[in-house]
């Protein structure tokens, strides 16, 4: 069935001129992305005209739309089909579902600071139990370069400095800084105070981090410490066995116990007899944490998490003397001794264990393949729209031999007297073309999709035509068929041949004996024609198609 097309109405008026300008700009943009040969500097498209000869359109079939026409983008659907309430609801539900899945698959606790190891906490603002487990942190920690420590060895600043000076006034050496000396004296006092109040020597942090000596120059302590005769085994190991400077990752403040500074040596602490008056009273910042079951063993209850924290960031040398490690050190488990900072957060060890053992439940390759298959299926469901009974597609045979015009210029580079010496513009005018192809026009809701079929698909869609010929006069190099003189020349076309002939005229300089003065003009013509054919096939031939909103 033939269809009469009012060509003047389609291509005339302001709308027709705007459409012609859009086609001109489109072809010009495509030429700018084409790699040019060495003898062509640039190509510019100046004008496009539809001409006055309309194409012949014949309706061949009405079928269901091609599956590719149902592939849509959610964003474009939301922007272009705002009038369809049903589609809007489907799009909104799908988007909310995908956002929920993204949050769930992101991993619970992935951005939760409580899931981080204690030695990787984010300081006073993001540390474990920063304000809940241990009370308010010192505000000076925020501006400190050591995140969690504003003054090494002194929790809460220097408010308790008078306490350390009163107890260890004679033990400071001039070769060390006051802060380092205070840190060492404070740690010695903490160990003596804890041991003097009935704590056994099985506390892991006391054996892992024995009291270092920062007092004298010769390595011997000059500070008066209770039970001085029992402190001699602390110095069994030579000071040169293992030393390291305190680093940012190994210095931490415990909100309940005060601090656990790093030790330069691995020392062992012998058991001290319980004494109610064996040491000075602790400062307010070192108040004993409350334990509901056994108040005399609260430090042993919280000591192992600190040991686990330090052990993960420190490299400790073996003791030179005989080992004096208590048997309870290796038997203590984090599940029996939770970190005091984990009161308001899940246990770090349990979380890490679950993460490390969960992938072992299934094969990594099987899990990856399954996830990939699910993603592909989800992507397919997201893109394909639901088919409806009112969706339709029309198949046309379109034949054209008209006076369509395309004006462009190409700059030819002259290689004399040197390479690329000067560029000369060549004016190329496409004055007509011969076309025979099969087009597809599909309407799905408020969208119209259009494309041409390749020669093989065209024959399969409409079959062999009566006016098709297998040969004819024309340019055998290009394969274009030359129509007979006059008329539209449709009798010499081939079904699905698409662009079968392009007529072009070139102008450059002066002509001598009917020949061009430059031999590269023919190369420019062939290059331009090849690019025009390539642009048409890449942009208009299926599976490429154009979509129009109606």
Curated annotation (Swiss-Prot):
In this chain, composition skew of type Low complexity spans 356-371
Q: Does the keyword Methyltransferase apply?
A: no
**Which residue windows does the record flag with biased composition (Polar residues)?**
346-355
Task: Please provide, alphabetically and separated by semicolons, the GO molecular function terms listed in this UniProt record.
Answer: lipid binding
Its cellular-component GO annotations read:
endoplasmic reticulum membrane; ERMES complex
What sequence ranges are listed for the domain SMP-LTD?
Answer: 1-550
Main localization, broad class: mitochondrion
Q: Pro residues bias located where?
A: 270-286
Task: List GO BP terms, alphabetically.
Answer: mitochondrial genome maintenance; mitochondrion-endoplasmic reticulum membrane tethering; phospholipid transport; protein insertion into mitochondrial outer membrane
Self-association or partners: how does it assemble? Answer: Component of the ER-mitochondria encounter structure (ERMES) or MDM complex, composed of MMM1, MDM10, MDM12 and MDM34. A MMM1 homodimer associates with one molecule of MDM12 on each side in a pairwise head-to-tail manner, and the SMP-LTD domains of MMM1 and MDM12 generate a continuous hydrophobic tunnel for phospholipid trafficking.
Please quote what the entry notes about the protein's domains.
The SMP-LTD domain is a barrel-like domain that can bind various types of glycerophospholipids in its interior and mediate their transfer between two adjacent bilayers.
Protein name stated in the entry: Mitochondrial distribution and morphology protein 12
């Amino acid at each position: 069935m033939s269809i009469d097309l009012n060509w003047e109405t389609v291509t005339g008026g302001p709308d027709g001129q705007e459409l012609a300008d859009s086609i001109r700009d489109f072809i010009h943009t495509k030429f700018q992305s084409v790699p040019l040969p060495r003898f062509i500097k640039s190509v510019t498209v100046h004008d496009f005209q539809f001409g006055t000869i309309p194409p012949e359109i014949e309706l061949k079939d009405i079928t269901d739309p091609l599956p590719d026409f149902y592939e849509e983008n959610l964003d474009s659907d939301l922007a272009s089909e705002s009038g369809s309430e049903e589609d809007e609801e489907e799009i909104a539900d799908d988007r909310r579902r995908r956002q929920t899945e993204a949050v769930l698959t992101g991993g619970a606790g992935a951005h939760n600071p409580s899931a981080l190891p204690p030695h990787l906490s984010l300081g006073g603002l993001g540390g474990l139990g920063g304000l809940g487990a241990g009370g308010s942190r010192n505000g000076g920690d925020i501006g400190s370069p050591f995140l969690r420590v504003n003054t090494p060895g002194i929790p809460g600043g220097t408010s308790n400095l008078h306490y350390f000076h009163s107890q260890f006034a004679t033990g400071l050496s001039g070769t060390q800084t006051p802060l380092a000396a205070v840190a060492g004296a404070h740690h010695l006092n903490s160990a003596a105070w804890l041991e003097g109040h009935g704590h056994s020597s099985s506390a892991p942090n006391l054996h892992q981090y024995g009291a270092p000596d920062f007092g004298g120059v010769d390595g011997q302590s000059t500070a008066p410490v209770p039970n001085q005769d029992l402190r001699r085994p602390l110095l069994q190991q030579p000071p040169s066995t293992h030393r390291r400077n305190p680093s940012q990752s190994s210095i931490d403040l415990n909100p309940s116990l005060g601090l656990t500074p790093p030790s330069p040596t691995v020392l062992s602490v012998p058991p001290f007899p319980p004494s109610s008056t064996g040491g000075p009273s602790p400062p307010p910042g070192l108040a004993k944490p409350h334990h509901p079951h056994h108040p005399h063993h609260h430090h042993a209850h919280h000591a192992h998490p600190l040991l686990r924290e330090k052990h993960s960031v420190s490299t400790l040398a073996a003791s030179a003397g005989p080992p004096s490690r208590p048997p309870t050190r290796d038997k203590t488990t984090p599940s029996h001794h939770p970190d005091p900072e984990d009161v308001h957060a899940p246990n770090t060890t349990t979380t890490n264990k679950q993460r490390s053992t969960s992938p072992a439940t299934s094969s990594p390759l099987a899990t990856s393949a399954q996830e990939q298959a699910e993603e592909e299926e989800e992507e397919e469901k997201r893109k394909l729209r639901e088919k409806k009974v009112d969706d339709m597609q029309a198949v046309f045979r379109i034949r054209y031999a008209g006076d369509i015009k395309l004006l462009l210029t190409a700059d030819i580079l002259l290689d004399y007297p040197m390479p690329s010496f000067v560029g000369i513009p060549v004016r190329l005018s496409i004055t007509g073309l011969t076309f025979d192809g099969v087009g597809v026009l599909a309407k799905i809701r408020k969208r119209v999709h259009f494309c041409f079929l390749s020669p093989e698909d065209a024959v399969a869609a409409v079959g062999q035509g009566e006016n098709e010929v297998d040969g004819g006069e024309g340019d055998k190099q290009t394969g274009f068929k030359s129509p007979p003189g006059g008329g539209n020349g449709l009798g010499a076309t081939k079904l699905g041949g698409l662009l079968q002939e392009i007529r072009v005229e070139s102008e450059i300089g002066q002509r001598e004996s009917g020949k061009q003065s430059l031999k590269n003009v023919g190369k420019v013509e062939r290059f331009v024609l090849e690019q025009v054919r390539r642009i048409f096939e890449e942009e208009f031939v299926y599976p490429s198609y154009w979509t129009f909103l109606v």
